[in-house]
Swiss-Prot record:
Function, in words: One of the primary rRNA binding proteins, it binds directly to 16S rRNA where it helps nucleate assembly of the platform of the 30S subunit by binding and bridging several RNA helices of the 16S rRNA.
Subunit structure: Part of the 30S ribosomal subunit. Forms a bridge to the 50S subunit in the 70S ribosome, contacting the 23S rRNA.
Gene designation: rpsO
SUPFAM superfamilies hit by this protein: S15/NS1 RNA-binding domain
Pfam families on file: Ribosomal_S15 (PF00312)
Protein name: Small ribosomal subunit protein uS15
Amino acid sequence: MALDSVRKQEIIGKFKQHEKDTGSPEVQIAILTDRINYLTGHLKTHKKDHHSRRGLLKMVGQRRNLLAYLKRTDIERYRKLVTELGLRH
């Protein structure tokens, strides 16, 4: 199951910076985190699903790059997001 539109809208609503925000780093990182958490659970039960594992690793790398960008540009927003999502940094 991919991220359904209702769940995606909830995430966007929680992390948006302004009214029509869908592409800020915070929103992108939050959506990726939700997808990563889902895929992690999926891979615990389907250990041989290598296609999904590769997709998971790509998402983790993309999230890492977005987090590095946010940390480089605005450290306060980075710290707030990391604590809200419960990520290690």
